[in-house]
């Protein structure tokens, strides 16, 4: 087991502060678990653990997308706490995903609370828009955004630094069957996330590629999944150019003029 130092705790809080702004704006998508876990691992001095937890957590959250006011479990806290738990307690990445999910749900409800609370600012925002006061409108947006980012930082610091002793004690006290249950649940979550993604993106014409990838992984001995990813990228590029060439080969529809146009109105 490892101890998180005060400097590491503050660094993680600062990281999550920036990622919270990115999540609120959905600007650079740095809040995705694969990036959050990698950066967290770099701060903790174990990039390999960050990459492993990032890959698993990203798959688990691949199909979870906000829709309107509905918020899925928070990807930032999921990535952060999965890596922190795996590094500080020594459990494997699959178990860490299951243990990190409650922190993700906690942040999900905090974000939903902010969605409701910030409705109080709408009267002020409408007034600024009506008066074309762009400076005040900008300050209002920055105020709400910084409140959310600060909440991210405070919760991250409390969960990673102040609560690490209790977290390690909890992991030690868990019986083997419960730890194995979290490991099984964590192993299933990436499959569930990928299944949710396929519900949106899957098309019947791509079934051969799915079968080819499955056979490649199961029956061809490779040390890692990088060859499969490269093969998938090749298929994607092929489909892109193939679809583009088919689109260019289609004849362009020509508008027929069955009756003489009237230009009496000048148009």
From Swiss-Prot:
Pfam families: EII-Sor
Key words, A-Z: Cell inner membrane, Cell membrane, Membrane, Phosphotransferase system, Sugar transport, Transmembrane, Transmembrane helix, Transport
Domain PTS EIIC type-4: 1-237
Residue ranges that the Swiss-Prot or TrEMBL entry lists as coiled coil: none
TM annotation in the entry: 11-31, 34-54, 67-87, 95-115, 142-162, 178-198, 210-230
Cytoplasmic-side positions: 32-33, 88-94, 163-177, 231-267
GO annotation, cellular component aspect: plasma membrane
Residue intervals annotated with topology Periplasmic: 1-10, 55-66, 116-141, 199-209
Localisation per UniProt entry: Cell inner membrane
Keyword Transmembrane carried by entry: yes
Principal subcellular localization: membrane
InterPro entries for the chain: GatZ_KbaZ_carbometab, PTS_IIC_man
PROSITE patterns assigned to the protein according to its UniProt record, in alphabetical order: PTS_EIIC_TYPE_4
Membrane topology recorded in Swiss-Prot or TrEMBL: Multi-pass membrane protein
Presence of keyword Transcription: no
GO BP annotation list: phosphoenolpyruvate-dependent sugar phosphotransferase system
Free-text comment about domains: The EIIC domain forms the PTS system translocation channel and contains the specific substrate-binding site.
Functional note: The phosphoenolpyruvate-dependent sugar phosphotransferase system (PTS), a major carbohydrate active -transport system, catalyzes the phosphorylation of incoming sugar substrates concomitant with their translocation across the cell membrane. This system is involved in N-acetylgalactosamine transport.
Name of the protein in its database record: N-acetylgalactosamine permease IIC component 1
Organism: Escherichia coli (strain K12)
Gene: agaC
């Amino acid at each position: 087991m490892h101890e998180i130092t005060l400097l590491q705790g503050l660094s993680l809080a600062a990281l999550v502060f920036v990622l919270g702004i990115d999540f609120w704006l959905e600007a650079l998508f740095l809040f995705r678990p694969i990036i959050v876990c990698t950066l967290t691992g770099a701060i903790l001095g174990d990039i390999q653990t960050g990459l492993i937890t990032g890959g698993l957590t990203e798959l688990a959250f691949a199909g979870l997308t906000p829709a309107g006011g509905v918020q899925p479990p928070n990807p930032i806290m999921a990535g952060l706490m999965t890596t922190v738990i795996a590094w500080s307690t020594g459990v494997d990445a699959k178990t860490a995903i299951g243990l990190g999910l409650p922190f993700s749900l906690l942040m999900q409800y905090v974000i939903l609370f902010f969605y409701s609370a910030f409705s109080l600012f709408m009267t002020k925002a409408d007034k600024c828009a009506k008066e074309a006061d762009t400076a005040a409108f900008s300050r209002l947006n920055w105020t709400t955004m910084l409140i959310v980012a600060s909440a991210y930082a405070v919760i991250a610091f409390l969960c990673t630094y102040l609560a690490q002793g209790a977290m390690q004690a909890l992991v030690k006290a868990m019986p083997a069957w419960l730890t194995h249950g979290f490991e099984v649940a964590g192993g299933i979550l990436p499959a569930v996330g990928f299944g949710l993604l396929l519900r949106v993106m899957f098309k019947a014409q791509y079934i051969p590629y799915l079968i080819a990838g499955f056979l490649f992984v199961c029956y061809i001995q490779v040390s890692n999944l990088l060859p499969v990813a490269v093969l998938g990228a090749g298929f994607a590029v092929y489909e892109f150019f193939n679809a583009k060439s088919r689109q260019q080969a289609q004849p362009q529809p020509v508008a027929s003029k069955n009756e003489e146009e009237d230009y009496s109105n000048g148009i």
